[in-house]
């Protein structure tokens, strides 16, 4: 669920860091797309200029229309996708923290979003308004394993990161720890 969970100040404050888009898999795919798109773009340029710009092959033998042109367009589209991936990583979209403070009786859920008026996503509430901690499990092709906070007068607030689902034992452990800390029930098992 999180990169780290910290309970301090006499067990009255629970702080959970949530990993956003700065995951290894995102770095991996952004790098692969950048390298592949650069290769396609250089192959297209090489076929047009009849100068070899690649180390591994000789694209000067390609006919520019249609092969070189299409490779150049694929390369440009791939570089646009790679730029998007690197910007999402740089902005750490989805990253943030969950903070539960029993001293002040408040809950603060914070996430980074896309640039604009909703760049900082903050949800503040009181601990007394929490009804339960809910576990959602859906198996299949696109499995969902997530923790939600059920608060009076609001829809369920997701607490876990998006992406790779947590193991069932980790999900149950985190959910039980949070429900125990807040003094509410754990639903969905």
From Swiss-Prot:
InterPro entries reported for this sequence: PSI_Ycf4_assembly
Top-level taxonomic group: Bacteria
Membrane topology: Multi-pass membrane protein
Pfam family, one: Ycf4
Example of a GO biological process term: photosynthesis
GO CC term, one of those recorded: photosystem I
Subcellular location: Cellular thylakoid membrane
Stretch forming the signal peptide: none
Alphabetic keyword roster: Membrane, Photosynthesis, Thylakoid, Transmembrane, Transmembrane helix
Chain segments annotated as transmembrane: 29-49, 69-89
Role, per record: Seems to be required for the assembly of the photosystem I complex.
Family stated for the protein in its record: Belongs to the Ycf4 family.
Protein name per its UniProtKB record: Photosystem I assembly protein Ycf4
Organism of provenance: Nostoc punctiforme (strain ATCC 29133 / PCC 73102)
């Amino acid at each position: 669920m999180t990169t780290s969970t910290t309970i301090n100040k006499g067990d009255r404050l629970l702080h959970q860091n949530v990993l956003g888009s700065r995951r290894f898999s995102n770095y991996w795919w952004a790098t692969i797309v950048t390298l592949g798109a650069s290769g396609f773009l250089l192959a297209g340029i090489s076929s047009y200029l009849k100068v070899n710009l690649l180390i591994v092959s000789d694209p000067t033998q390609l006919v520019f229309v249609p092969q070189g042109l299409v490779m150049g367009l694929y390369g440009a589209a791939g570089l646009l996708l790679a730029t998007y991936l690197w910007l999402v990583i740089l902005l750490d979209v989805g990253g943030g923290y969950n903070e539960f403070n029993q001293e002040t009786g408040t809950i603060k859920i914070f996430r980074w979003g896309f640039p604009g008026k909703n760049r900082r996503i903050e949800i503040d509430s009181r601990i007394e308004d929490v009804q339960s901690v809910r576990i959602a499990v859906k198996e299949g092709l696109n499995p969902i394993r997530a923790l939600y906070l059920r608060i009076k007068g609001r829809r369920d607030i997701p607490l876990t990161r998006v992406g790779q689902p947590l193991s069932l034992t980790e999900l149950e452990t985190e959910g039980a720890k949070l429900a125990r800390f807040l003094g509410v029930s754990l639903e969905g098992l």
